[in-house]
Amino acid sequence: MNVNDCICVGAEPIAFVDYLAMERTDPRIAEEIGKGLSRGAEMANISIVGGETATLPDMIRGMDLAGACIGYAEKSKIVLGDKIMEGDVIIGLGSSGLHSNGYTLVRKILKEKGFSYSHKLGNESLGDILLTPTRIYVKEILELLKNVDVHGLAHITGGGIRNLMRLNKKVKFVISDPMEPQPIFYFIRKEGKVEWKEMFQTFNMGMGLAVIVPRDEKDDAISILEKNSEAKVKEVGYVDKGRGVDVKKFKLHYE
């Protein structure tokens, strides 16, 4: 998650520190967390340069895991979204699932409906689906930044599709052909009776990252992303006059 935020301003992640606080020491859980952090650092091509582990039974229930990422960018190449203009194209990169957002709502639904984490959704258990690691987009975005005039990058995390508005409040982002959400999102909507508008402003709904580029560089951008990413790459919309975000298929508008 941290490295994905870092690349959204055009910065290359270079280092990471982690912090793990536990109610009681559990070597097995700590080992699994360490493996995950190591794998994530490898995928992002960064070093874990430090961290802290604490046992705090008076303050923590379960555990608290946090981290911080440091990145580098030349000042003249920082991506702020101020170059976004009418006619630009929005390209989506597929997510791997929930991406660490909306879990409070998911746990509430599972508890109220009596679902166990072993409950099958398709060929996978809910537990395995919820533990699917967040997709890391560092490699493909750094390659894209070298070759295309990227106007904006949005990490679709908490806040969902509304995160596009953080890039530029003077235009309207139109999602005309959204990515297909994974089955877990349909499950959440059905079992929790959650409206589409709430779903799209809480979850990534299948799109983990949005890239905004000039229309005349769209084909090059898609080609570079497809060659360097494991994620599905798709043109999902465009930038228009107005303000906010439209998701046309679901007749949604956010301001």
Residue ranges, per PLM feature:
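Glycine-/charge-enriched secondary-structure boundary and capping motifs
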Residues: 29-47, 58-63, 122-131, 135-255
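Short loop/turn motifs at secondary-structure junctions
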Residues: 10-12, 105, 149, 232
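Short connector loops/turns at beta-strand edges and beta->alpha or beta->beta junctions
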Residues: 9-13, 111, 115, 159
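Active-site cofactor/substrate anionic-group-binding motifs, chiefly glycine-
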Residues: 1-8
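Glycine-rich anion-binding loops of enzyme active sites
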Residues: 12-104, 238, 248-250
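Acidic, glycine-rich loop-and-beta core segments that form the ion-binding/anion-interacting portion
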Residues: 86-124, 128
